[in-house]
Amino acid sequence: QLWATGHFM
C-alpha cells in the first residue's frame, strides 16, 4: 500500500 511505503521508508 502507498501509506506503507512512507511508513517503512
Curated annotation (Swiss-Prot):
Its main location: secreted. The modification Methionine amide is found at residue 9. The keyword Transcription does not apply. It comes from the Eukaryota. InterPro entries: Bombesin. The modification Pyrrolidone carboxylic acid is found at residue 1. GO terms for cellular component: extracellular region. It is found in: Secreted. One of its GO terms (biological process) is neuropeptide signaling pathway. Keywords: Amidation, Amphibian defense peptide, Pyrrolidone carboxylic acid, Secreted. Expressed by the skin glands. Belongs to the bombesin/neuromedin-B/ranatensin family. This is Rhodei-litorin. It comes from Pithecopus rohdei (Rohde's leaf frog). The lineage of its organism: Eukaryota, Metazoa, Chordata, Craniata, Vertebrata.
